[in-house]
Swiss-Prot record:
It is a multi-pass membrane protein. The lineage of its organism: Bacteria, Pseudomonadati, Campylobacterota, Epsilonproteobacteria, Campylobacterales. The keyword Membrane applies. Gene3D superfamilies: F1F0 ATP synthase subunit C. The record marks 83 as: Reversibly protonated during proton transport. GO terms for molecular function: lipid binding; proton-transporting ATP synthase activity, rotational mechanism. GO terms for cellular component: plasma membrane; proton-transporting ATP synthase complex; proton-transporting two-sector ATPase complex, proton-transporting domain. F-type ATPases have 2 components, F(1) - the catalytic core - and F(0) - the membrane proton channel. F(1) has five subunits: alpha(3), beta(3), gamma(1), delta(1), epsilon(1). F(0) has three main subunits: a(1), b(2) and c(10-14). The alpha and beta chains form an alternating ring which encloses part of the gamma chain. F(1) is attached to F(0) by a central stalk formed by the gamma and epsilon chains, while a peripheral stalk is formed by the delta and b chains. It comes from Aliarcobacter butzleri (strain RM4018). The chain crosses the membrane at residues 31-51, 75-95. It comes from the Bacteria. This is ATP synthase subunit c. Its main location: membrane. F(1)F(0) ATP synthase produces ATP from ADP in the presence of a proton or sodium gradient. F-type ATPases consist of two structural domains, F(1) containing the extramembraneous catalytic core and F(0) containing the membrane proton channel, linked together by a central stalk and a peripheral stalk. During catalysis, ATP synthesis in the catalytic domain of F(1) is coupled via a rotary mechanism of the central stalk subunits to proton translocation.
Amino acid sequence: MKKIVLLMLAIAGIAFAADEAVVNETLKAYSVVAAGIGLGLAALGGAIGMGNTAAATIAGTARNPGLGGKLMTTMFIALAMIEAQVIYALVVAMIALYANPFLG
């Protein structure tokens, strides 16, 4: 742990000595990478959640066909909520890319 702290302190001096233009370009590049990774993970999680929701709805309808209509309604509500989370991740990614508060 002490080695990591010393390494971070040593690197901090280099970061503070860097030119502002270089820091801004590096921050832009890291913002693009972070937005891509974050949006990719959100889409992956959303796809897994939607697949599980659809599978559970199909299984429920197969067990009790009389509840198919209610299950479909509940499934569509759940899918909308799952998709909303992915859209929130997209909004955060757009903020990181175009309205980054850390860029001067």
